[in-house]
Amino acid sequence: MKERGTYFLYTIPECPYCTMAKELLRDKQHKFVVMELNREHATLLRLKEEMDWGTVPMVFQLEGRNHKFIGGYVDLKKKLEGKENDE
């Protein structure tokens, strides 16, 4: 059986795509950690600027001490379905 990845999600309350990302990871039996922030939290604003990304969730794949920015819900879904190179 293929080893499941571990993911880290930055989310905000009442975000439907954040909820769908968490449900998708649960359904696919991946481990994940969620940090829920408000829209104006300094960490979220800084990450959006650093990653040049304007929406949530912001999904990272954890690999040891490293992390790789995946994107949002749609990007996560493509990755988990093996379609990350499809456009």
Which role fits each region the language model picked out?
Residues 18, 41, 70:
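Loop/helix-junction capping segments adjacent to catalytic residues or to phosphate/diphosphate-binding pockets
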Residues 19, 23, 45, 78:
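Alpha-helical elements of the RecA-like P-loop NTPase motor core of helicases
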Residues 61-87:
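Non-catalytic, surface beta->alpha helical segment in thiol-disulfide oxidoreductase systems
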Residues 1-33:
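Local sequence-structure signature of Cys/Sec-based thiol-disulfide redox active-site neighborhoods
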Residues 36-54, 80-86:
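Thioredoxin-like thiol-disulfide oxidoreductase module
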Residues 16, 38, 77:
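Nucleotide phosphate-binding site architecture
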Residues 23, 49, 71, 75:
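Catalytic phosphate/metal-binding cores of nucleic-acid and nucleotide-processing enzymes, i.e., regions
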Residues 51-53, 57-60, 75:
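Long, continuous compositionally biased terminal/linker segments
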